[in-house]
């Protein structure tokens, strides 16, 4: 039996600028079809100037949405403009998933959940580590740091060209996080069980600097939040050096699942068929 929200839960969105490149409509479209839901999920290009009005329309119901996703450059604005952000988004200062509840806009951030779910699927046992190295201190690194800290990783070393930005993250996320300059990379790699690239290095096939991963723990995992190309230069380097690697596509797929459940009432599964649909689309637009 459908609940009384049926007329509202049928239409969701992803809003960003630009947003034409988004693969979220493919992901949610796959799940809608699989469950036989008569709903929609569409991309909407919304400029920064227009975003507050877009949020107002969502709250008032004039936009016809039950909720949706927000992507660059609106994640911080979505957090600020929502009525009830949760603790995850509050610590990050950014939200990527919105839903209407009793006339209010609620908000969360599912990026970190997507990141660890990808590792859980592709590198079982990864969280038995004691130390991790995060390359980059931009917005993308926040959710990764939060998620692995909350999974119990005791030492998280953030390495960045501008160490001041890494120190800001250490101040935000507590004593488990340590800030370093790039010069410290060889030292902090020693014995670490997880290496995460959160920078744009290697995106779209661009070259990446050579990294000697040999000081990592023998069973360490190297992962990249970049998923175009699927196997980035950093992942190729790590694989050639004998380490387990996990591409970034699974993070994109898994972060989408909590929102779908909020809007449409069913928990979707990230399966190989969905993964192949997205890879096929990536190949088509390569």
Swiss-Prot record:
GO molecular function, one term: NADP binding
Residues noted as binding NADP(+) in the record, renumbered to the chain: 87, 136-140, 160-165, 225, 248
GO cellular component: cytosol
CDD domains attached to this UniProt entry: NAD_bind_Shikimate_DH
Reactions it catalyzes: shikimate + NADP(+) = 3-dehydroshikimate + NADPH + H(+)
Pathway in which this enzyme or protein is active: Metabolic intermediate biosynthesis; chorismate biosynthesis; chorismate from D-erythrose 4-phosphate and phosphoenolpyruvate: step 4/7
Cross-referenced Pfam families: SDH_C (PF18317), Shikimate_DH (PF01488), Shikimate_dh_N (PF08501)
Keyword field contains Plastid: no
Keywords for this protein: Amino-acid biosynthesis, Aromatic amino acid biosynthesis, NADP, Oxidoreductase
Active-site residues, record numbering mapped to chain: 75 (proton acceptor)
Cleaved signal peptide residues: none
Positions annotated to bind shikimate: 22-24, 71, 96, 111, 227
PANTHER family for the chain: BIFUNCTIONAL 3-DEHYDROQUINATE DEHYDRATASE_SHIKIMATE DEHYDROGENASE, CHLOROPLASTIC, SHIKIMATE DEHYDROGENASE
HAMAP family, per database record: Shikimate_DH_AroE (MF_00222)
Subunit structure, as described in the record: Homodimer.
Family: Belongs to the shikimate dehydrogenase family.
This protein's name: Shikimate dehydrogenase (NADP(+))
Organism of provenance: Sinorhizobium medicae (strain WSM419) (Ensifer medicae)
Taxonomic lineage: Bacteria, Pseudomonadati, Pseudomonadota, Alphaproteobacteria, Hyphomicrobiales
């Amino acid at each position: 039996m459908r609940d009384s929200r049926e007329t509202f839960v049928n239409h969701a969105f992803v809003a960003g600028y630009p947003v034409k490149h988004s693969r979220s409509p493919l992901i949610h479209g796959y799940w809608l079809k699989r469950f036989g839901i008569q709903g929609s999920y569409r991309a909407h290009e919304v400029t920064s100037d227009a975003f507050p009005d877009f949020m107002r329309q969502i709250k008032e119901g004039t936009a016809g949405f039950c909720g949706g996703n927000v992507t660059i450059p609106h994640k911080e604005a979505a957090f600020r403009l929502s009525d009830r952000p949760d603790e995850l988004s509050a610590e990050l200062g950014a939200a990527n998933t919105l839903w209407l509840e009793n006339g209010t806009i609620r908000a969360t951030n599912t990026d970190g959940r997507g990141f660890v779910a990808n590792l859980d699927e592709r590198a079982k046992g990864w969280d038995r580590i004691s130390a991790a190295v995060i390359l980059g201190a931009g917005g993308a690194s926040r959710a990764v740091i939060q998620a692995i800290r909350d999974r119990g990783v005791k030492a998280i070393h953030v390495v960045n060209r501008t160490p001041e930005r890494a120190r800001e993250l250490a101040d935000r996320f507590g004593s488990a996080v340590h800030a370093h300059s790039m010069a410290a990379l060889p030292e902090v790699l020693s014995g670490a069980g997880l290496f995460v690239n959160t920078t744009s290095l290697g995106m779209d096939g661009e070259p990446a600097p050579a990294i000697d991963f040999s000081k990592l723990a023998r069973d360490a995992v190297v992962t990249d939040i970049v998923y175009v190309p699927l196997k980035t230069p950093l992942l190729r380097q790590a694989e050639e050096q004998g380490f387990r690697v996990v591409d970034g596509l699974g993070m994109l797929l898994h972060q989408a699942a909590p929102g779908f459940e909020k809007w449409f009432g069913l928990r979707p599964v990230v399966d190989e068929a969905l993964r192949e649909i997205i890879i096929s689309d990536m190949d088509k637009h390569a």
